[in-house]
Amino acid sequence: MVALFVVATIIVFLVIDYFVQRAAKRKAALAPAAHVSAKPRFVIPKGYFFGKGHTWVELLPDGLTRVGVDDFVQKIIGPVSAVELLPANTVVQKGDRLFTLRQGGKEVSFRAPISGKVVGINDDLVHSPGVVRKEPYKEGWVLLIEPTNLAADIKQLSIGNEAALWLREEIKRFRNFITAQTEVPAASGSALPAGVTLMDGGAPVNDVMEHSPQEIWQRFETDFLTAGNGKKSANS
């Protein structure tokens, strides 16, 4: 009798454990992922679309889109001292200059990932530009755009795993780019300072461009922020 009681008790616990585990697995399957990451240090939030010029687009319920700069760029350029924004009601075409981040006397400009009209700006960035660095996907958003050709433009953006794969390739490309800059003859005045290195695994260290001259910032803009946006020159 005792043996039967023990066996019955074990069976009861096994059944309870089965349903607990099943419920936990179901909950995990239904819970939304916080983000996908190309590397642990570079975040790609779920549901955000990414342009080739390292801007992101978030579709809002009211039909507007929120635009900002991705985690990759804000980490490698370092602290932001000022943000230059287009005024509200400005009409932009995909690939037009949209906003500029400054660090002292250096700057890089970002292109519009979609066409539309600027209907709002993040005023907080005027007084606290560092928010772009702290919260690039939330409080650090840059502009609100009312899209005019979203159906076509969105096809040229990436999302989720596709965006993560693209960013991995961008990290590799940046590694080659920054390595080439360290090999520029010092006499040219545009080489990276001694001691700037990359972490193992191909990912750049934070702030790797902070102490580089404007010439390298300009090359970075041309190679990474302008390419793929329909503009031939970073100055257009």
Region locations from a protein language model:
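Contiguous, well-folded functional domains in the mature portion of proteins
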Residues: 1-236
